[in-house]
């Protein structure tokens, strides 16, 4: 008996040490594509882009059948207690996630009925004024009955870090029309385990959390991660409010109002699927379970501000893995998917969103800039940033460096110039003066914050504070932070050195270097009001860039990514009271943050408006409408520009390309009436996969349950509103099919342009398309010279009734 217990304990410890999470895909169709024939179960599949009635007896009985098969396989192979099944995936893919040892994973790979076994991998988050910037209040919301009808009955699902349900952006009473029951959504609402109150209120229509993989990996901490849909990070609340937050919510911090916030579709319903957490991000097994559940519940739109930390270990292509295959199933079910492009810019091939069925969103800087200035006693004015009030007008204040006002007893266990600890600074010397602090790497790493600098300065009675940057690494992002007292961050190193030189020259010291008299003076300007720039939009420095890649050897794909550009820099939106994702906004109700995480929900919300107006449109049709009506011209009438590094590693502006912005910056009002669309369905996506060189047909069958019987000839013939040819030899012709979604017949003139290395020709030069009808046209590209670089161009279809449809063209000429 004693020996048996010891053996059991040893075996359990062995599993704990070596077990990992694996995602297993099985033979047999998931619910979305099952056509019947398995043990007498009737078909559950519907036509592409249609929704399944997940409550029907057909669906529920087949779902139970699949789960029993998963359990039977595990029970047949392994002793009970030696493994843990985390999820059964039944709706979009047929498989399960399990916590098993590597040896057990190998047994699963060899087991009959198993198609693939993938070790789980991590994902990460890709982290007001924009409705006006995009023209929603004047040009879009009125067409749907006003802001209190914009997005009516459209459900947006958020795969993110949860939601703070008590925020006014999500209040159900902030509307003139009460929310009633939704006609088709079937998701459930979890309760707060502490208050026993539901997370749902009519505006929030579904709320669930997924953490089985996180728990199995030992990453989940219930004290800070919350075993509920509660947002312990802030990121999820921020993204949900961007897409579907209530209209006209005052953004207040430190006694100041920074405008009024609104979601893109303020009447849309919010369905929360929490699968990301504050410290470790998330696991694909949890994210796949969340997506599977969201589509089962009946969401219309999925917003994904999430991407992989690294490529999956066992897949050969970027398009085929459990995550992308699940999203393909979602699109097949009629769900539009917006995913953040990633924050690896401005470097090429940094995208984390690859597949043609996903709408990949890059981040733009809009026309609002928060600038401030510091005026020195010698009259020199230094530019900086800071969302703060000014010091008293017509008055200068002495400036004191934190390093010069240290208390003698302070232990130097941290960098005192960071100004994070008021107790180590001499209040008598700081009081009434401007505190001069240093912006060290600790601010980049998150162990120091501007919020704490402001609190330190206020505690010491300072008139304000200045942060100087003495050195900076490429990629360092400086965002303005709201402050309760006057404050400014001097982001330019040369200007910071001007300030330091002025301070050192004017400060009187004894022979030991101790200050005898502080004589440097300065005053801080008013940084509360934004300045509007006509150069907007611009592609943000951090926004991931193309070209798209088809495998993890970084070979270029014949598919343009990103797809579209949307606001993603300095976005005001809701924040969780528990949020710790941004140190500067801990405990606040709103946050001003940047990332492609912020761009994706803009597109999700705008897609909801398009879906509201055109409820029968497929995800590809919605994507096409957004892309073909986007703009490549900024507010000043110039071609879009992108932030980029110069040779000296300073940030500069260069002419942007489709690898920066895709088709262009979103134009919501035009997207509601695009004239023509480039539609595509499930078979088109399979055709793209089957014609992409290097993708094995067996692998396609494993992940999609669909054989390669489609004749597309070349992946560039996939019917998307862009053309990309990574290996153009001599001449190649591609075709596109357009459908007239306007109410009347229209004649389109087709023109094209291309950079000199590639010749371009379109045929026919004009065509008439009846309402509801489809026509094809061809684009022929010919290599004129091999330059070793991509050439960029555009095809434009200009309609006789005012519609204008554009698609970008990218191609690289090769000798063979």
UniProtKB/Swiss-Prot annotation:
<feature type="active site" description="Charge relay system">
    <location>
        <position position="160"/>
    </location>
</feature>
<dbReference type="GO" id="GO:0005576">
    <property type="term" value="C:extracellular region"/>
</dbReference>
<dbReference type="Pfam" id="PF00082">
    <property type="entry name" value="Peptidase_S8"/>
</dbReference>
<feature type="domain" description="Peptidase S8">
    <location>
        <begin position="120"/>
        <end position="672"/>
    </location>
</feature>
<feature type="glycosylation site" description="N-linked (GlcNAc...) asparagine">
    <location>
        <position position="504"/>
    </location>
</feature>
<feature type="active site" description="Charge relay system">
    <location>
        <position position="235"/>
    </location>
</feature>
<keyword id="KW-0720">Serine protease</keyword>
<dbReference type="InterPro" id="IPR010259">
    <property type="entry name" value="S8pro/Inhibitor_I9"/>
</dbReference>
<feature type="glycosylation site" description="N-linked (GlcNAc...) asparagine">
    <location>
        <position position="578"/>
    </location>
</feature>
<dbReference type="InterPro" id="IPR023828">
    <property type="entry name" value="Peptidase_S8_Ser-AS"/>
</dbReference>
<feature type="domain" description="PA">
    <location>
        <begin position="418"/>
        <end position="492"/>
    </location>
</feature>
<dbReference type="InterPro" id="IPR023827">
    <property type="entry name" value="Peptidase_S8_Asp-AS"/>
</dbReference>
<keyword id="KW-0645">Protease</keyword>
<keyword id="KW-0378">Hydrolase</keyword>
<keyword id="KW-0964">Secreted</keyword>
<keyword id="KW-0325">Glycoprotein</keyword>
<dbReference type="InterPro" id="IPR045051">
    <property type="entry name" value="SBT"/>
</dbReference>
<dbReference type="Pfam" id="PF05922">
    <property type="entry name" value="Inhibitor_I9"/>
</dbReference>
<protein>
    <recommendedName>
        <fullName>Subtilisin-like protease SBT2.6</fullName>
        <ecNumber>3.4.21.-</ecNumber>
    </recommendedName>
</protein>
<feature type="domain" description="Inhibitor I9">
    <location>
        <begin position="22"/>
        <end position="124"/>
    </location>
</feature>
<dbReference type="GO" id="GO:0006508">
    <property type="term" value="P:proteolysis"/>
</dbReference>
<dbReference type="InterPro" id="IPR034197">
    <property type="entry name" value="Peptidases_S8_3"/>
</dbReference>
<feature type="glycosylation site" description="N-linked (GlcNAc...) asparagine">
    <location>
        <position position="702"/>
    </location>
</feature>
<feature type="active site" description="Charge relay system">
    <location>
        <position position="597"/>
    </location>
</feature>
<dbReference type="GO" id="GO:0016020">
    <property type="term" value="C:membrane"/>
</dbReference>
<dbReference type="InterPro" id="IPR036852">
    <property type="entry name" value="Peptidase_S8/S53_dom_sf"/>
</dbReference>
<dbReference type="InterPro" id="IPR037045">
    <property type="entry name" value="S8pro/Inhibitor_I9_sf"/>
</dbReference>
<dbReference type="InterPro" id="IPR015500">
    <property type="entry name" value="Peptidase_S8_subtilisin-rel"/>
</dbReference>
<comment type="similarity">
    <text>Belongs to the peptidase S8 family.</text>
</comment>
<feature type="propeptide" description="Activation peptide">
    <location>
        <begin position="20"/>
        <end position="126"/>
    </location>
</feature>
<keyword id="KW-0732">Signal</keyword>
<keyword id="KW-0068">Autocatalytic cleavage</keyword>
<feature type="signal peptide">
    <location>
        <begin position="1"/>
        <end position="19"/>
    </location>
</feature>
<keyword id="KW-0865">Zymogen</keyword>
<dbReference type="Pfam" id="PF06280">
    <property type="entry name" value="fn3_5"/>
</dbReference>
<dbReference type="GO" id="GO:0004252">
    <property type="term" value="F:serine-type endopeptidase activity"/>
</dbReference>
<dbReference type="InterPro" id="IPR000209">
    <property type="entry name" value="Peptidase_S8/S53_dom"/>
</dbReference>
<dbReference type="InterPro" id="IPR010435">
    <property type="entry name" value="C5a/SBT2-like_Fn3"/>
</dbReference>
